[in-house]
Amino acid sequence: MQAGILAAAGIIVRIIGILYRSPLVAIIGDEGNGYYSTAYTIYTIILLISTNGIPSAVSKIVAGLMAKKQYRNAHKILMGAFCYVFVAGGLASAFCFLFADSIVGKSSAMVLKVFTPTIFFSGLLGVFRGYFQAHGSMIQTSFSQIMEQIVNALVSIGAAVLFMSFVKDADTSTQAVYGAMGSAVGTGAGVLTALLFMAAVYGVNNKMFRRRRERDRTREDLSYGQVFKMIFTMVTPVILSTCIYNMSSATNLEIYCSIVEKLKGYTEAQATTFYGLYSGKANPITNIPIAFATAMSSAIIPTISGSFEKGDREGTKKKVGDAVKTTMLISIPAAVGMAVLAKPVVFVLYPQQGTLDMVAGLLRILAISVVFYGLSTLTNGVLQGTGYVNRPVIHAAIALGIQTMVLALLLVFTPLDIYALSVAAVCYSFCMCIMNGLCIRKKLGYKQEVVRTFIIPMVSALGMGVVAFFVYQGLNFVFVTMKLLEKGTLNWGLNCICLIFAVLVAVVVYFALVIKLGGVNREEMIALPKGRTLVRIAEKIHLLQK
C-alpha cells in the first residue's frame, strides 16, 4: 500500500515534469535546454556526493531502531542526520558556486551557480523524508514530492520568461542562458516549498514523537559518537552507490562533448544542444516508469530491513519477489509502449519538428533500458535493506567502466554520435541488473520465479504493442481518408487523439492478456497503484471472477 502511494506520487511527479518541460523548451529553445541539462547533470552529481544518500540511510537506521522500540535513539539519528547535512550541504553548495566555471563551460556555469542553494535545501528535505519513510508512512513524502514539482513547474516557466525579458535585445545564445537560469530558480523554489511543508508536518507530529521517547525503556542510549559512526557507515556506501550509479550521466556528458568537439568538429553550442535532446527530452520520458521502481526501492528498504533484523528470511524473500514482480508488470509494457509509440509520444510533448525524428530514435533505444533500470534500482534497495550496502557500489563501478568503454568506442568508430548515449545507457543498466541479481541469489539464497514475473508480462506486452501500433496507424489512415490530415504530415491535435486512443486500448489489451495468461491474481492486482479499481474493472468485463 505504502509503496503504491509513493509509486503513484513518483509517476505523477514525472508526468508533471514532462508536461512542463514542453512549454519550457518552447520558451528557452533547444540551446537553453542544453545549458540547463548540462548544469543539472553536474548539480545532480554534487547533490549525490553531499547529501543524497541521507534519505535511504535515515530510513534504514531509524526503521531498525523503531523495530526494537528504541525511540530515543531514533531521534538521535534524526538530529545527527541534520548536523551531517548542515555541514555536507553547506560545503557542497560553496564548492558548486566557487568552482562552477572550472567544472562546465561558461554558459552552463551561470546556470549551475543558480542551483547552489538548492543543494543545501535538498539535504534537509531528505532527512525529513527518510524519517517519515522509516515510520512506514509514505503519504507525507508523496505529497511533498507532488507539491515540489508543481511549484517547480510554475516557477520555472515564469522565471524563464522573466529572466529572458532582462536580455530581450541580446543575441539568442545569451537569451538561452538566461532562460536556463530561470528554469534553475524553479528547481530551488520547489525544493524549498517541500522542505517547509515537511518541517510543518514534523511540527504537527512532534508531540507524538516526544511521548514515544518519554515512554522508551531502552537501557542504553547511543552516544553522538556512535550516532555519527552509524550515519557515516550507512551513508558512505549509499552515496558511493548512488553517486556511481548516477555518475554515468556526468561521464557521458564529458566523453560525448570531448569526442564530438575534438574529433568531429562540433562547436560547444552544437554539442550542448544535441546532449540536451538526449538528457532533456528523451531521457525524462523513460523516468516515468522508472519512478515506480524508485518508489518501490524506497519503500522496500525499511520493510526488508525490519524483516531481516528479525531474522525472517522467508518473509524477506517474499517481499523481494512481490516487489520484483510488481515492478516488471509496470516496466515491461511501458518499455514496449515507448518503443512502438516513440514518435507520437515525443511529438505530443515536444512538437519541435526539426528534432522530432532524432529524439524519437533516442527514445526507442532508451525504452530497452526501462526494464533494466527498473530492476536494478529495485535490487539496489534490496541489497541495501539486507545489509549488503557495498555490493551496489562495486557493481555500479564495474558497470560504469564497461559503459564508458562502450560509449567511447561507439563515438570514435561508428557514426552513431548522439545515439551512442542511448546504447551506453542500455549497456550500463543491463550490467547493473545482472550483477545485482546474481548477488541477491548468492547472498540471500533467493531465486526469482521466471514465467509469471518475466515471460507472461513480456508476451502480453508484445501483443499489446502490436495492437497499439495498428490502432494508432489505423486512426491516422482514417484522418487522411477524411482529408483532415495530409499523408506524411503531423498535426498535434489529431496526433493526441490517435495516441490517447491507442494507449487506452493498449492498457486494456495488456491487462486482459496478463490476467488470462495467469500472470497476476486478485491479490497482486490490489497491490498495484489503483489496484482495487483495476480489480473492479476486471470483474465487470469478466476477466476475474467475483
How does the language model describe each region?
Residues 24-45, 107, 173-181, 229-234, ...:
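Interfacial/gating helices of multi-pass transporter permease domains
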